[in-house]
Amino acid sequence: MAHGSVTFRDVAIDFSQEEWEFLDPAQRDLYRDVMWENYSNFISLGPSISKPDVITLLDEERKEPGMVVREGTRRYCPDLESRYRTNTLSPEKDIYEIYSFQWDIMERIKSYSLQGSIFRNDWECKSKIEGEKEQQEGYFGQVKITSEKMTTYKRHNFLTEYQIVHNGEKVYECKECRKTFIRRSTLSQHLRIHTGEKPYKCKECGQAFRQRAHLIRHHKLHTGEKPYECKECGKAFTVLQELTQHQRLHTGEKPYECKECGKAFRVHQQLARHQRIHTGEKPYECKDCGKTFRQCTHLTRHQRLHTAEKLYECKECGKAFVCGPDLRVHQKIHFGEKPYECKECGKAFRICQQLTVHQSIHTGEKPYECKECGKTFRLRQQLVRHQRIHTREKPYECMECWKTFSSYSQLISHQSIHIGERPYECEECGKAFRLLSQLTQHQSIHTGEKPYECKECRKPFRLLSQLTQHQSIHTGEKPYECKECGKAFRLYSFLTQHQRIHTGEKPYKCKECKKAFRQHSHLTQHQKIHNGI
């Protein structure tokens, strides 16, 4: 009987054309990752082999990997067959015959390769080439595993394994954070996050990585190699996955869909980030104040508030910003650039998000609903701010006077009181404002523009907040209720004024006679006495 050391063919996976087309995009991506990982594990065992065709094509081709699809029968290379036939099986060793699907074989080899020297010196795999098998044998391959030390070998069922992948079932759980994974190899990679292990080190700069694929990608930064070019626009990429993701910009393909709301994404990472909105998961925590964030970039931006680090400075006016996107948005003020135009009314905006927010005015869509009072909002941020009315949460604190605010914009507006800064000046009348939004609102006085119209009575308004307040007259809605006496109000400012009756607070003081008032209008009326009006 002939035998030889295990070859990459033994641990490779191949599909028929029909089978390949049955796989969805996520499974095809998984296939690519598994084949690369298998190849990496295989060559780490020591055998010196040339790169198999399937890996070369995965590395170089621009289209989907049809090259790994078998059509009809399986073909073996003659040089591999001769290797199998020239060696003789040692009769002293025990032989375990295992009939298994190729995916099963791959899982076992990966599993045992992680357990030290068993794979290197103590056992050999034998793949018997029997020619063409019967059609009904399908994926089965016969492998003879020779070992003195290995006495047991747990057999997996391929159908179960395939169903786990196909159904998205996550059976491998991390004991540290309880996160679950479809494949054991992915769990092994994840565990390195907790252990801090980074076994793959760049010889050029010394930077270390948890995964070999990350090292390979990083190494191309040193070489400047970008072998994957988009045929549509000519943009080049270091890895095939980046090209695949980029091409979806041209095709409009969004294969990753959220099961909660149906929103689709080009990249799986985008879907993962989006799903945290539904789950409420915020895995990134600030070590200074304990605040948590859904995205790592949000944490990085927040941490600069503690360090007062402003790396991005405007060359026009010298104003500095915590992050690059804020600087780019600011620079459009100097350039007068407003590239995002509403097709309904022609109004233009500096950033795309502003246009998206504006368009919901025309559609009337309010998808975000408060579970406490049922009020709906156009923007999620509006819902979050509104919910703080119910929770009375004020997470933003002024470091100068320790006053707290329910929104970050209120804090920024307040802080300019301490520094006296009013950088936004009206070119018509010279009046200056602390916030750009205040200047924008003010300018509508000069232009006479009233873009916000009530659909009930057609009355127009300069500001959206004015329209919102007005609409509550038609609906009779009074969502702001005093918890002391139960009285309800249309506007939050009305509730705030009313609550001063219960608290006795009188924040508005006359500088002439030191008399205090609950409302600013009462102070204004009182000052007329001193002015002789």
UniProtKB/Swiss-Prot annotation:
Location of the protein in the cell: Nucleus
Residues annotated as domain KRAB: 6-78
Zinc finger residue extent: C2H2-type: 172-194, 200-222, 228-250, 256-278, 284-306, 312-334, 340-362, 368-390, 396-418, 424-446, 452-474, 480-502, 508-530
Entry keyword annotation includes Lyase: no
Keyword Phosphoprotein part of the UniProt annotation: no
Highest taxon of source: Eukaryota
InterPro entries, alphabetized: KRAB, KRAB_dom_sf, Znf_C2H2-type, Znf_C2H2_sf, Znf_C2H2_type
Cellular component terms per the entry's GO annotation: nucleus
Keywords from the named record: DNA-binding, Metal-binding, Nucleus, Repeat, Transcription, Transcription regulation, Zinc, Zinc-finger
UniProt GO BP: blastocyst hatching; regulation of transcription by RNA polymerase II
Any GO molecular function: RNA polymerase II cis-regulatory region sequence-specific DNA binding
Family: Belongs to the krueppel C2H2-type zinc-finger protein family.
Function, as annotated: May be involved in transcriptional regulation.
Name of the protein in its database record: Zinc finger protein 14 homolog
Annotated source species: Homo sapiens
Lineage, broadest ranks: Eukaryota, Metazoa, Chordata, Craniata, Vertebrata
